[in-house]
Amino acid sequence: MTDQTAASPRVLVTGGAGYIGSHVLHALTDAGIPAVTIDDLSAGRREAIPAAVPLVEGDIGSAELLDRVMRDHRVDAVMHFAGSIVVPESVVKPLDYYRNNTANSLTLLGACLRAGIDKVVFSSTAAVYGAPESVPIREDAPTVPINPYGASKLMTEQMLRDAGAAHGLRSVILRYFNVAGADPAGRTGQATPVATHLIKVACQALLGRRPPLAIFGTDYDTPDGTCIRDYIHVSDLADAHVLALLHLRRGGGSLLMNCGYGRGASVREVVRTLEEVSGEQVPATFADRRPGDPPQLVAGADRIREQLGWVPKHDRLDGIVRSALSWERSLEQSVGQAGAPGGSASRS
């Protein structure tokens, strides 16, 4: 670390040992942007964090810890990933989600105000839309979440808006669609032991690390009868976060935008692409629809391109699948898989 880097303001990344947080830390490091991360490592992986990034092991629910880190590392902006993200779990453990995702975000925003930090990039979700009336889903679509996970994220969005109106805090809220894939250089990826994301689950089934892939519903009103989702490569998502940070550091105002490509792929398309990439057959079974699964979830993606100048580099489905499969194969050679998709600075 150079003296100049040590003296530069840092961006605080919460949950930097998790799936998305670690990719963003690598993107920041690649761009020469100093960062520090807080993660309690309850689900994140220490080795996913770039060597140049200081790790403070702890819980973002601690106001004292946040105050100290923001002061000691001269933090001027925050990227907030830490939290709980499993939709079915949120239904059976709703209060855990309101604590980890909403109450801890309140603690974080309070620390920002005390430290005079007025720039926040927030990891939100398309789950705030609930069951959309039409696709593609634009940012002005109704927000009617149908599970505590989506509701907990929407509450944090509202806190950011209110803090902006009252205190001048500026934020970029990024609503993710279906994040998938892994760092093309193999530095990090999704290492969740019990995965629920389709592409990761399909790769694990292909490699014999879990039972055959269950395809839920083949009678949807889609071209091949299976659900369609907008899959975005995690490295493109990480680049969007860097652009959002630079926008705020240039004095830009608050933004709300979807993170997706504006086009979707069906479950059958994902499976077929994985088979083409691997040259092997994915073991799969067919099951009834899952309650609450919309036929299509596709982002309206014009705003992020227009307002941040975001240009995806990894938007081919075969590239997303290939990077995910390569990462899964690398995990076969390692011991233990303690990772998290969204970060783990506070997680039940």
UniProtKB/Swiss-Prot annotation:
<feature type="binding site">
    <location>
        <position position="125"/>
    </location>
    <ligand>
        <name>substrate</name>
    </ligand>
</feature>
<dbReference type="InterPro" id="IPR036291">
    <property type="entry name" value="NAD(P)-bd_dom_sf"/>
</dbReference>
<comment type="pathway">
    <text>Carbohydrate metabolism; galactose metabolism.</text>
</comment>
<keyword id="KW-0299">Galactose metabolism</keyword>
<feature type="active site" description="Proton acceptor">
    <location>
        <position position="149"/>
    </location>
</feature>
<keyword id="KW-0413">Isomerase</keyword>
<dbReference type="GO" id="GO:0033499">
    <property type="term" value="P:galactose catabolic process via UDP-galactose, Leloir pathway"/>
</dbReference>
<protein>
    <recommendedName>
        <fullName>UDP-glucose 4-epimerase</fullName>
        <ecNumber>5.1.3.2</ecNumber>
    </recommendedName>
</protein>
<keyword id="KW-0614">Plasmid</keyword>
<comment type="similarity">
    <text>Belongs to the NAD(P)-dependent epimerase/dehydratase family.</text>
</comment>
<dbReference type="Pfam" id="PF01370">
    <property type="entry name" value="Epimerase"/>
</dbReference>
<keyword id="KW-0270">Exopolysaccharide synthesis</keyword>
<dbReference type="InterPro" id="IPR005886">
    <property type="entry name" value="UDP_G4E"/>
</dbReference>
<keyword id="KW-0119">Carbohydrate metabolism</keyword>
<dbReference type="InterPro" id="IPR001509">
    <property type="entry name" value="Epimerase_deHydtase"/>
</dbReference>
<dbReference type="GO" id="GO:0003978">
    <property type="term" value="F:UDP-glucose 4-epimerase activity"/>
</dbReference>
<dbReference type="GO" id="GO:0000271">
    <property type="term" value="P:polysaccharide biosynthetic process"/>
</dbReference>
<keyword id="KW-0520">NAD</keyword>
<comment type="pathway">
    <text>Glycan metabolism; exopolysaccharide biosynthesis.</text>
</comment>
